Each structure stands twice: as C-alpha cells, then as structure tokens.
C-alpha cells in the first residue's frame, strides 16, 4: 500500500508539471493544429499513467481524472473549446479545471457552501456495511448481488467526489459540478443521459463529439437526421471511453460489451426523440410522469447488468471491496501510530 501511494503521489506531481507545460507553452500558440500537436505528448503520457498501478483504486483514479477528463479537455483547449476556454486566470485553476469536473465560482461565499456532513456520514456508514456484506455474497441471489454492486460503485464515487469537492473548495473556492441530478426521477432516456446522470460527461461530449458530428452530417442530411447521428456518435465515443476505463481496471482485452450497452442506449434514445417529435405523439399521446419514470428507470436497471458483466466476471468488484477495507485498516493503523507518537 505504501509503495503504491508513493507512486501515486509521484505520478500526480508529474501530471501537474505536464499540465503546467500546457498552460505556459500552449497558450502562446494559436488555437488549432499546432496547439494540438503541443499537447498530444501530454495526452499520450496520461494514457500510460494508469498502467503503473496494481491497485484498482489508484489505476481507476488516474484513468478517470487524467486519461479521460484531462485528455478530452486538453484536446478541446487546443481549439479554444470546452471548460478551459476562456483561459483560467491562474495556473492552479487551470490545473484543477483540467483534472476535475469543477465549476469555478466567481464570488464564492463560504457561508453558502455547506457540506451535508450528516448525509456524507450516512453514505460512509452504508458503504462500510456494504463492504462487510461481500463476505456473504455466496448467499445472495445474482439479482441482489447486481444491486449491491451498483450501490457499491455509486457510493464509492459519491464519497470520492465529495472529498474532492471539499478539497477543491478549500484550495480554490471552486465548486465541483454535481455528478447527478436525481437520476431516478428521469422521465426519458434523453432526460436520464443528458440532464440527470453523470452530468460532466454530456458537458464534455457535446463540444467534443456531438456538435462536430452534427455539423459534418448537416452537409449530407437534414437537421433532424444530423442531430440523431450526433447523438449516436456521442454514445459510441462514450462506449469506447468506458471500454478504455475498464481495460485499465481489468487489464483484459475489451470484449465490446460496454460499447454495445451504450450503442443500445444510443439507438433507443434516438428512437425515443424521433417518436416524441412525431405529430401524433405531440398531439394525442400523453404519458404520466410516474409511468415514464418507471419505464425509464426499469429499462436502465435491466440493461445495466450488461454494463457490469466485465467487472463482475474479472472480480474487480471484489477487489474494490478488499482494497477499500485495506485502506481503512491502513488509515486506522497510521492514526493509532500518530496518537501513540511512534
């Protein structure tokens, strides 16, 4: 654990130096191909960083924050697009916006920033109890185990982002973008993926994939068809990115299952939008919000098994649980040593 932690710190220092290079050098180069060429070596470096770890948590953090977030933002920055445009005023803000899904506040007020400690504590308690439940997984049905796996991933991400949110606010006065907006209240797939679940992803995929694909498609087809192709392209890229993230976690050749999951949802979302645009539906067919929520959430839950199969099959979920317990023991041990003065 200690060696992995030291390696984690070293690589984050390297990442900060690399992003600083992009801030000072790339800003002196006009937006376009030449700026892109100047940041591509950094993007390549960020693709390699997760491979230096054997712990799933460290590899996953590197893959998520650098290989995925930072790389997409730097590529958009090369063309004066995305969250790094206009250029942040300070290097520290540039680094944080590059690595994390943050939303800078112009006039942050610490009195308005209240971390719900009680909610955080409840999530931590549930998460710890859930970790202990893995010892009894042989007694759980596959359906219940899938629910446990989904809850485990959700809670772990929530806890990590809450900690990062507090750290970023303390250092910069910036607030993190909310990771979700009550996804269980989604009334359609378009609502779920575009406005409720993992909100930072559509915020990046829109300028990086959807808009360019739609503009190119407009040359050959009408505006509605171009919009559908743009949506489908965004889901395709999202699937490819998740395949990459799963590769870093499992170190196994991608099977394409995750990509097919996103392609399925892309096709269904496009079909849903097309149906809602039809005259008959707009005039005569009204579905109550309760029914639409049940249908939407039910479809997402049923198909989510496809998304989790690679992680379950490779034992990554169990490794995440064991590493989390090991981390808790490590912190407890260090805390006791600190108290005893040894």
UniProtKB/Swiss-Prot annotation:
Keywords: Acyltransferase, Lipid biosynthesis, Lipid metabolism, Membrane, Transferase, Transmembrane, Transmembrane helix
Membrane-spanning parts: 9-29, 36-56, 58-78, 115-135, 153-173, 227-247, 255-275, 297-317
Pfam families for the chain: MBOAT_2 (PF13813)
Enzyme Commission number(s) from the entry: 2.3.1.75
Compartment list: Membrane
Purpose: Catalyzes the final step in the synthesis of long-chain linear esters (waxes).
Protein name per UniProt: Probable long-chain-alcohol O-fatty-acyltransferase 3
Taxonomic lineage from the root: Eukaryota, Viridiplantae, Streptophyta, Embryophyta, Tracheophyta
Gene giving rise to this polypeptide: AT3
């Amino acid at each position: 654990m200690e060696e992995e932690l030291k390696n984690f710190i070293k690589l984050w220092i390297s990442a900060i130096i690399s992003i600083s290079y992009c801030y000072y050098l790339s800003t002196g180069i006009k937006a376009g191909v030449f700026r892109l060429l100047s940041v591509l070596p950094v993007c390549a470096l960020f693709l390699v960083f997760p491979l230096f770890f054997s712990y799933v948590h460290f590899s996953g953090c590197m893959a998520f924050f650098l290989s995925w977030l930072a790389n997409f933002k730097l590529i958009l920055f090369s063309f004066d697009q995305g969250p790094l445009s206009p250029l942040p005023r300070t290097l520290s803000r540039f680094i944080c916006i590059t690595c994390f899904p943050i939303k800078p506040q112009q006039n942050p007020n610490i009195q308005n920033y209240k971390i719900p400690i009680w909610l955080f504590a409840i999530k931590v308690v549930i998460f710890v109890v859930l970790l202990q439940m893995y010892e009894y997984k042989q007694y759980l049905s596959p359906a219940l185990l899938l629910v446990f796996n989904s809850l485990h991933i959700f809670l772990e991400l929530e806890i990590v982002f809450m900690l990062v949110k507090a750290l970023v606010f303390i250092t910069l006065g910036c607030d993190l973008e909310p990771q979700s907006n009550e996804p269980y209240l989604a009334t359609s797939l378009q609502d779920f993926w575009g406005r409720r679940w993992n909100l930072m992803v559509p915020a990046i995929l829109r300028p990086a994939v959807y808009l360019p694909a739609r503009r190119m498609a407009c040359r050959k087809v009408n505006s509605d068809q171009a919009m559908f192709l743009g949506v489908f392209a965004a889901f395709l890229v999202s699937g490819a990115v998740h395949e990459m993230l799963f590769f870093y976690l499992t170190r196994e050749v991608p099977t394409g299952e995750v990509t097919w999951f996103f392609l399925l949802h892309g096709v269904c979302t496009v079909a849903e939008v097309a149906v809602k645009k039809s005259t008959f539906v707009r005039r005569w067919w009204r579905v109550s919000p309760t029914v639409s929520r049940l249908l939407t959430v039910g479809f997402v839950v049923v198909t989510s098994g496809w998304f989790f199969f690679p992680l379950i099959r490779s034992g990554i979920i169990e490794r995440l649980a064991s590493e989390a317990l090991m981390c808790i023991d490590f912190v407890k041990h260090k805390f006791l040593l600190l108290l005893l003065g040894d």
